Amino acid sequence: MIISAACRAVVNGEENVFPIMRHGDFYRWMKMLHCQYNKAAVEQGFIDWNEEKRIERFVSRAEAAKIAKECNQILPHMREEFNPNCLYSEDIY
């Protein structure tokens, strides 16, 4: 699964938008947002999902930034500094 370049745009111009996410953490976080956010995002074309419901790509920088900021509220226990490269990876899962 590839997270697109739009994810890296989440942190462009902003430092420490959200904490670092180790393998699997990003997927679990998005599952937590699924009921309240992802349905509308998918319908509007901001996020595409494959049959396994894993994130395929972001296509909107504004929406990527919005959910990145929500991460601080959802995973407050992750206090490490964010590394943009950890989100922009072909091997994130």
Residue ranges: model-predicted function:
Residues M1-Y93:
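Short, surface-exposed polybasic-aromatic patches that bind anionic ligands, especially phosphate groups
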